[in-house]
Design a protein with these regions (language model features):
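Hydrophobic targeting segments
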Residues: 7-12, 36, 44-47
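Short aromatic/hydrophobic "clamp" motif used to bind/position activated sugar donors
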Residues: 106
Length: 324
């Protein structure tokens, strides 16, 4: 089944100018909208940004000027100074945009990314096999490899997918983004003088892990609360790998047709990130044994780099923890 572009809405979420400490490449959102008109003619464009943003000349089909929920307090340092992240801004701009979608399919894209092709549309249905016991989405959701991490500090980790780009059924994207806002972390006076954050004194989860853990636990009550970045077990790792094989299609940006601004483009593939071949091997293992991919194929591209770099990353992390 081919998907008609008119059955797709594209939610562009985030600021269109530099905002609250986040820099923005001038004209990038204009470029984003123009790229959608070029590569998805007939699709509905929804820009979901903030009150007070100058949207002159952007001309989306639907413009949402959301009330800014502000940054979320997620930590306190030893001096009691709060650390903040944009958890709720990401949720509000994404979820409110998706709630305006009336088409069966939707794209969620950052306001500082753009399209270079529409290859992701066909890719969404190119890997139809599922592991029935692991199906949480109605159909596959396409996401990209950039910042989708398999390793942190030389260790395998779980629940750290990329949040740059999603394409799939609108109902499935809402499963990811329509989640409750995160409350500010309250300062605990009994822990004054020590850092306070999720997982302390261990290394706290990455922001993407916290998002993913929230929506995955909403979909499956057996998923544990992720206390720290490296929380893992053979059972949890297998669960996560089955999930991404059965519910996602993980592609390189160029396979999707996703354009990234310069600061998101690495000089070479990062060894700690998943690659499409990694995902394809998991898809073969859990969903479709006929797929032609092997561990040696991965070794020839990124595997040898991991063998060289990950042990040193692990040793460096352990030394850092000892110094604490």
């Amino acid at each position: 089944m081919s998907i008609d572009f008119k059955d797709i809405s594209v939610v562009i979420q985030g600021p269109v100018q530099a905002y609250q400490g986040r820099s923005q490449e001038p004209g990038i959102t204009h470029k984003c909208i123009a790229s959608i008109r070029t590569h998805l003619p007939g699709a509905t464009i929804i820009l979901s940004t903030w009150e007070g943003q100058d949207c002159h000349g952007l001309n989306p089909d639907i413009l949402l000027l959301n009330k800014d929920p502000g940054a979320t307090i997620v930590s306190y340092n030893a001096k009691g100074e709060p650390g903040k992240l944009n958890f709720n801004r990401q949720i509000v701009s994404s979820a409110e945009g998706l709630k305006q979608v009336t088409t069966p399919y939707a794209v969620k894209i950052r306001s500082d990314n753009f399209l270079t092709s529409n290859d992701f549309v066909a890719a969404q249905q190119a890997f139809p096999a599922r592991n029935d016991a692991s199906k949480l989405f109605t159909q596959k959701v396409v996401t990209n490899t950039s910042y989708f991490r398999r390793y942190a500090d030389g260790q395998k980790i779980v629940m750290l997918p990329s949040d740059f780009f999603h394409f799939g059924l609108t109902e499935d994207l809402l499963k990811i983004w329509d989640i409750p806002l995160f409350p500010d972390r309250e300062f605990d006076p009994t822990k004054a003088g020590s850092p306070q954050y999720r997982g302390a004194p261990k290394v706290g989860p990455h922001a993407e892990q916290i998002y993913c853990n929230a929506w995955l636990r909403k979909l499956d009550s057996t998923v544990p609360y992720l206390q720290h970045r490296h929380q893992n077990s053979p059972e949890l790792l297998a669960y996560w790998e089955r999930f991404i094989a059965s519910n996602l299609v993980v592609l390189e940006p160029e396979q999707i047709g996703l354009g990234l601004i310069q600061r998101f483009i690495p000089k070479s593939k990062r060894p700690n990130e998943i690659c499409h071949q990694d995902w394809l091997l998991l898809y073969k293992q859990y969903c479709d044994p006929s797929i032609a991919i092997s561990k040696f194929d991965i070794f020839k591209t990124i595997g040898w780099k991991r063998m060289c770099k990950l042990p040193f990353s692990y040793i460096k992390h352990q030394l850092t923890q000892i110094k604490k």
